[in-house]
Curated annotation (Swiss-Prot):
Domain of life: Bacteria
UniProt subunit comment: Homodimer.
Catalytic reactions on record: guanosine(37) in tRNA + S-adenosyl-L-methionine = N(1)-methylguanosine(37) in tRNA + S-adenosyl-L-homocysteine + H(+)
A single MF term (Gene Ontology): tRNA (guanine(37)-N1)-methyltransferase activity
EC number: 2.1.1.228
Keyword flag Heme: no
Keyword check for Cell membrane: no
Cell compartment(s), UniProt: Cytoplasm
Species assigned in the record: Legionella pneumophila (strain Lens)
CDD domains (UniProt xref): TrmD-like
Keyword annotations from UniProtKB, A to Z: Cytoplasm, Methyltransferase, S-adenosyl-L-methionine, Transferase, tRNA processing
Residues annotated to bind S-adenosyl-L-methionine: G115, L135, G136, D137, F138, V139, L140
Its job: Specifically methylates guanosine-37 in various tRNAs.
Name the UniProt record assigns to this protein: tRNA (guanine-N(1)-)-methyltransferase
Length: 250
């Protein structure tokens, strides 16, 4: 059965990009079903207005409770009963790969609420949102792009969505580390060579090299991740070799 994903958005046109690439193929294969609902369709105000000035004053506009609540209620009625409603905002918990794996494993319908303007009426968040997530400590013009990023990351974890079964497993962060470097033909170009070990055909040595590079890249670029990973004695040896090769103390 297809995973049902929904998006509440004032700009459904933005979401069309999700029908291309990996996510688009997953939709075509019937692995995922994606629907959008526009709160303007439930607005009773002139010109389908869905925003109003914030109580207490201040800049910007706030998306009103009534049309947004009606859109959420309608969307949930068309999705599975165990549908989870997610609001994407800078105030949410920053999502990590492990969070995405847990969410994907639940195989639960997900309804994403994409905010705009100064945000949405707080009563929606407190009474009609199950989880609040953020992509990081920065602000976007709306939640549509964040929802698409979230959905793309979820779809990659669905079996059959990628061309190779090992692609998602090898992604950065899947095992707590950054991915190893990748090369393709030609073996030499502009004086730059592919590492010999990748050309030799010794799969055991290739696996060892990739693990060492993964550990090393994590040490160079995201050392904070190493503090959260339990390294084996072999991992520690490989990391020590990498550090020595890159001018660190041997």
């Amino acid at each position: 059965m297809a995973l049902h994903l929904g998006i509440i958005t004032l700009l459904p046109e933005i979401i069309q990009g999700i029908h291309y690439g990996v996510t688009g193929r997953a939709i075509e294969q019937g692995l995922v079903k994606i629907d959008c609902w526009n709160p303007r369709d439930w607005s009773s105000r002139p010109y389908k207005q869905v925003d109003d000035k914030p109580y207490g004053g201040g800049p910007g506009m706030v998306i009103m409770y009534e049309p947004l609540h009606a859109a959420i209620k309608h969307a949930r009625s068309e999705m599975k009963e165990n549908c989870k409603t997610i609001y994407l905002s800078p105030q949410g918990k920053v999502v990590r790969q492990n969070d995405l794996k847990q969410i994907a494993a639940q195989k639960q319908s997900l309804l994403f609420v994409a905010g705009r303007y100064e945000g949405i009426d707080e009563r929606i968040i407190s009474h009609h949102v199950d989880e609040e997530w953020s992509l990081g400590d920065f602000v976007l013009s709306g939640g549509e792009l964040a929802a698409m990023v979230f959905i793309d990351a979820i779809i990659r974890l669905i079996p059959g969505s990628l061309g190779h079964l090992g692609s998602a497993v090898q992604d950065s962060f899947m095992n707590g580390l950054l991915d190893c470097p990748h090369y393709t033909r030609p073996a030499t170009i502009n004086g730059l060579d592919v590492p010999d070990v990748l050309l030799g055909g010794n799969h055991k040595e290739i696996e060892r090299w990739r693990r060492k590079q993964s550990l090393g890249k994590t040490w160079l670029k995201r050392p904070d991740l190493l503090e959260k990973v339990q390294l084996s004695e072999t991992d520690k040896q490989l990391l020590a070799e990498f550090k020595c090769e890159h001018g660190d103390s041997c």
